[in-house]
Amino acid sequence: MTQLEIPASDKQHTNAMNNQQLYERARQLIPGGTQLLSKRPEMFAPDVWPAYYREAKGCEIVDLDGRRFVDMSTNCVGACLLGYANEHVNQAVQQRVQSGSMCTLNSPDEVELAELLVELHPWADMVRYARAGGEALSIAVRIARAATRRDQIAFCGYHGWSDWYLAANLSGEVLGEHLLAGLDPAGVPRGLDGTVFPFQYGDLDALREIVRNNTPAAIVMEPLRQRYPEPGFLEGVRQLADESGTVLVIDEVSSGWKFHCGGAHMKLGIEPDMAVFAKTISNGYPMSAVIGRSHVMDAAQTSFISSTYWTDGIGPAAAIATIRQMQQNDVPAHLESMGARAMKKWTELGQQYDVPAQAASLPAMSALKFDHPQQLMMHTLFTSRMLDRGYLAGSGFFPTLAHTEQHVDGFIDAAGEVFTEIRDAIANDDLESRLKTPVRQTGFQRLT
């Protein structure tokens, strides 16, 4: 029997396993245990974090063991702004499934969605689709390279797992400064070294230097993440792109529709050459879109960009329904309100209990942290104890339309009980001894 073969006696039925048993099995069958790094239990509280769900509705989750939680974490990394299993989106998807989600012909929803996206973004003329953020960004980079006949890319921020992006780490650990540390470029061709050039958000001089000394096909950047830009920064980026004939690509995969119906770039007054959407555009169903100006997007016809499941009917149906709901509800205002409420009360709680609690970033993508040398232990203890109180909690809170003031206040009340223990643990210097689980991980690490 080879190493990869599984004895028949070990092939247990997954529906008979609890959360921890199933995750241990997953680690044997799936490299890394999960498909998304941010869903690894090791990123929260190893051995106690519920890896699997049975039901998810609104902002509540029932795990595989039947326990009910209010999700006060990142809510699937902000993918479901309307809340889990939104009835309007689900109804549109169910209608498409019943009518057939895939066949030899194309779904007319592709055209309706394209019309809707171009209507929302007057600067854009054309649309291409994919089903995930990383691949949509790769499409945008391919189109930019085809349009300019150039190879190099300037970027800032986090842009996924693709070769074009991870090539930045072939010369050293530079991507750790752009959100996620530990991104080893194993498997990325060494020939891509020197094709991508990172710059820090807000550092216009660094970008100017890149453009002066190289010939980038595109500037790829998030419009914002942890803070709003300083006056003149985005305008300066736009000017540099225009002067150098470089395609400006705005990555809205994370910022998405959280700050404005149509994307953060619209709130900030910047008109790119291309914008990329995923996650929030379809409220939990696989869908992504690249929109852009016709003189750039036309280049997609000169390069082979094609895939069968980019034509399924579910993604466009979900996206149309999601966008319609966002047009009818002021989602950004609600996210701002709920996030700001949580950040304010988190900071006040820290002051009340003399715990080094710190709220950072923007309300729609808030970070609720501990400013302490043992902050990883604190977070692990906090997450473990909040599970006992019926809350999924990590180091960030991405609110949804389903969250109410009652959800936020209930979370803060429960956190106050846990802060009492954290305060005592700091005073007694016994944080580690209180943990019944390994300390949480940060960044990308191999699971042994």
Language-model regions, residue ranges each:
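PLP-dependent enzyme catalytic core of the Aspartate aminotransferase-like
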Residues: 327-329, 337, 388-448
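Structural signature of PLP-dependent enzymes
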Residues: 323-344
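Active-site PLP attachment segment
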Residues: 270-299, 311-318
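Conserved PLP-binding catalytic core of the aspartate aminotransferase-like
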Residues: 340-344, 350-383, 399, 433-448
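Active-site core of PLP-dependent enzymes with the aminotransferase class I/II
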Residues: 203, 209, 221-247
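Glycine-rich loop-to-alpha-helix module at the N-terminal edge of alpha/beta enzyme cores
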Residues: 68-149
